[in-house]
Amino acid sequence: MSKRITKTSAIHDKHSIITRDTESGFEYDSDSESDVENVFPNIRVQRIRDKLYQDEDEDEDEQVDDEDEEDEEDKEDEEDDADNFENENEEEVDDYIDGDGMRNFDMGESIEVGDVDSTSERKNGKIKKLTSRQLQKEQKRIKRTGVCYLSRIPPYMKPATLRSILSRFGKIDRLFLKPEDSAIYHKRVKYGGNKKKNFTEGWVEFVNKKDAKMCASTLNANKLGGRKTSYYYDDVINMKYLSGFKWFDLTQQIAKENEVRQAKLSLELSQQQKLNKTFVNNVEKSKLVSTIQRKRKERDPEHESDSHIRRSFKQRKVTSTRADADEELKARAQPDRKLSDVLSKVF
């Protein structure tokens, strides 16, 4: 049985608080709040609403304070960067760090090869120049790296699978796999072969050269192992650690090969253009000659035989120094006696 709440006097001690219900007009002591809520459910609903509104206001205030603090920190960082650039007396390097155009060169995955180096920072869409300190740090990082060459890759192995296998020995930075020739691929698919991508060779860059040496010495000419149910359990991989070889050497070699291929292509195109131009000129000349002959025939049909245009070509003499050749050809191949006499007198 719920207790009956009566009007209380305004006199109360410091531990009790007089509360008034706006709807019923009753005043009650805060010590019996649970009883009041049971009797007047509207009071409980109102309290819950007030508490929710209060919590939302506090959350909004905290978010505003956090945003203000973040804005202040960003402004302070920008001011510090500006001060550092103004106060720097060190020489700035004009060269830019090349973007990792070949980063994660997984040919099977669109050559993951394409992120900008972590040392170069972007600001307003432009790459900032590196200071000498940053350049030294980058050079030290490059010096610690090691590159391994993969002369044989298990058939139809994906770059992600190879990366997961090699990452057991250490952290891998970039991976480049060379796909097979497109003609071989289309021929295999044409005759009902496997449609998966196959890679012939590759290069892998380790962050630490010690890991690269360990990986090459462990996996070279050995089975990959792992679970017996694995597709590549019995496959063999050939690896070799390239001493003193860095990733930019590979990029330079690839760029050089691309330049040579482009030069050959441009040379072939120029030769073909010359042939086409010569062919067009000959066709025009033949049309011109046929037109001249037709007009002459219309003017004077009696001299049809004379209207034929005769052309003369310069013929070169055939010479030979072979033992089974004719004596006439051998005689032509001998040097002039007068010239030999003059040379003998001089020398």
UniProtKB/Swiss-Prot annotation:
Enumerate composition-biased segments (Basic and acidic residues). Answer: 10-23, 298-309, 328-340
Is the keyword Phosphoprotein assigned to this protein? no
- List GO BP terms, alphabetically: endonucleolytic cleavage in 5'-ETS of tricistronic rRNA transcript (SSU-rRNA, 5.8S rRNA, LSU-rRNA); endonucleolytic cleavage in ITS1 to separate SSU-rRNA from 5.8S rRNA and LSU-rRNA from tricistronic rRNA transcript (SSU-rRNA, 5.8S rRNA, LSU-rRNA); endonucleolytic cleavage to generate mature 5'-end of SSU-rRNA from (SSU-rRNA, 5.8S rRNA, LSU-rRNA); small-subunit processome assembly
Bias regions of kind Basic residues — which residues? 310-319
- Where does it live in the cell? Nucleus, Nucleolus
Biased composition regions of type Acidic residues, renumbered to the chain:
24-36, 55-98
Example GO CC term: the record gives:
nucleolus
**Annotated spans, Disordered:** 1-101, 290-347
Major location (coarse):
nucleus
Role summary: Involved in the small subunit (SSU) processome assembly and function, and in the 18S rRNA synthesis. Required for the early cleavages at sites A0, A1 and A2.
- The entry's protein name is Pre-rRNA-processing protein ESF2
